Amino acid sequence: MVTQNKKILIITGSFGNGHMQVTQSIVNQLNEMNLNHLSVIQHDLFMEAHPIMTSICKKWYINSFKYFRNTYKRFYYSRPNELDKCFYKYYGLNKLINLLIKEKPDLILLTFPTPVMSVLTEQFNINIPIATVMTDYRMHKNWITPYSQRYYVATKDTKDDFIEAGVPASYIKVTGIPIADKFEESIDKEEWLSQQHLDPSKPTILMSAGAFGVSKGFDYMINNILEKSPNSQVVMICGRSKELKRSLKAKFKDNPSVIILGYTNHMNEWMASSQLMITKPGGITISEGLSRCIPMIFLNPAPGQELENAYYFESKGFGKIADTPNEAIDIVSDLTNNEETLKVMSSKMLESKVGYSTRKICKDLLDLIGHSSQPDEIYGKVPLYARFFVK
């Protein structure tokens, strides 16, 4: 329990929505605990340190899912065993040091791969407690920070990855990936579907356009899914793509078995009430799906963390990879016409899911911060560096 004033600095990143969602889940949970002696601040380090360059990198990252997959693949898989090699290792260093001097946090929590943190721990002798929340299901070297005291990971397999990379087992906790508590709450599926003017007795296929990737061809997929699985109904989530939503609404306006939605705050209800989901394998989305035990189809996952997530879920029997829309349509047909297979997949997910991840992480963070040193004892060489180089 925190009995004196303490501060947590969360370093996150806005490359995709997942890292920010994880951060917000943790912040919300800590706020709900009404800890009067604890303050929590969060910073998008790279965006604040280099806004123009980071904005360019974000656009490249988003477009890499469509146009530069091989380039991103080479970047993601380059020198996997050289843990200290990263071309952006010093990116954001001055900003990070300024944050430490200004805020004097008692603990740093990373929800985004931040290689620059290793510079502080190795070269500047920072001994402030550092904890990391990994937001995917397979380890990548950029998540490793020397002298970090805690890694919160999704599964035992992820823990084994970290141990193999040299991280002590005692530093790693299998908590699951943090998601909102509402994904643990009971949902009346029949009531929800009836409210949406859908038939609760029919299999519901949930499709998500996702933040990145394809934005065309969904009309073809919906038509063919309904043709091959005529007893099904489809819910299409278009996200923030107004053009996609408008186009699909026009095409399916007279079909009562199809609902077209834009951005929604009700993914929890839709996941809980559907039998199958077609989605991109982002760490947060599939963690929410795992919590709701909804089997998933991963449509043409991008090389890198998405593909690794998809491989992992497929190996565990939680989902299937479809390289093309036609392959996805065939998988939907096979699964909706084989109810027993869907039940087996859901049962495997139920056995494997880790509940209340955010609560577990926050409880452990409070234990870590309760044993942290006083601020004037933890900053090593940073003040001297800052005096001469940091403005």
From Swiss-Prot:
The protein's annotated pathway: Glycolipid metabolism; diglucosyl-diacylglycerol biosynthesis
Localisation: Cell membrane
Keywords recorded for this protein, A-Z: Carbohydrate metabolism, Cell membrane, Glycosyltransferase, Lipid biosynthesis, Lipid metabolism, Membrane, Transferase
InterPro entries to which the protein is assigned, alphabetical: Diacylglyc_glucosyltr_N, Glyco_trans_28_C, Glycosyltransf_28_UgtP, Pro_diacylglycrl_glcsylTrfase
EC code: 2.4.1.315
Entry's Gene Ontology BP terms: enterobacterial common antigen biosynthetic process; glycolipid biosynthetic process; lipoteichoic acid biosynthetic process
One matching Pfam family: MGDG_synth
Catalytic activity: a 1,2-diacyl-3-O-(beta-D-glucopyranosyl)-sn-glycerol + UDP-alpha-D-glucose = a 1,2-diacyl-3-O-(beta-D-Glc-(1->6)-beta-D-Glc)-sn-glycerol + UDP + H(+); a 1,2-diacyl-sn-glycerol + UDP-alpha-D-glucose = a 1,2-diacyl-3-O-(beta-D-glucopyranosyl)-sn-glycerol + UDP + H(+)
GO cellular component, as recorded: plasma membrane
Gene Ontology MF terms: 1,2-diacylglycerol 3-glucosyltransferase activity
Function: Processive glucosyltransferase involved in the biosynthesis of both the bilayer- and non-bilayer-forming membrane glucolipids. Is able to successively transfer two glucosyl residues to diacylglycerol (DAG), thereby catalyzing the formation of beta-monoglucosyl-DAG (3-O-(beta-D-glucopyranosyl)-1,2-diacyl-sn-glycerol) and beta-diglucosyl-DAG (3-O-(beta-D-glucopyranosyl-beta-(1->6)-D-glucopyranosyl)-1,2-diacyl-sn-glycerol). Beta-diglucosyl-DAG is the predominant glycolipid found in Bacillales and is also used as a membrane anchor for lipoteichoic acid (LTA).
Similarity comment text for this entry: Belongs to the glycosyltransferase 28 family. UgtP subfamily.
UniProt-listed PANTHER family: MONOGALACTOSYLDIACYLGLYCEROL SYNTHASE, MONOGALACTOSYLDIACYLGLYCEROL SYNTHASE 1, CHLOROPLASTIC
Protein name: Processive diacylglycerol beta-glucosyltransferase
Organism this protein belongs to: Staphylococcus epidermidis (strain ATCC 35984 / DSM 28319 / BCRC 17069 / CCUG 31568 / BM 3577 / RP62A)
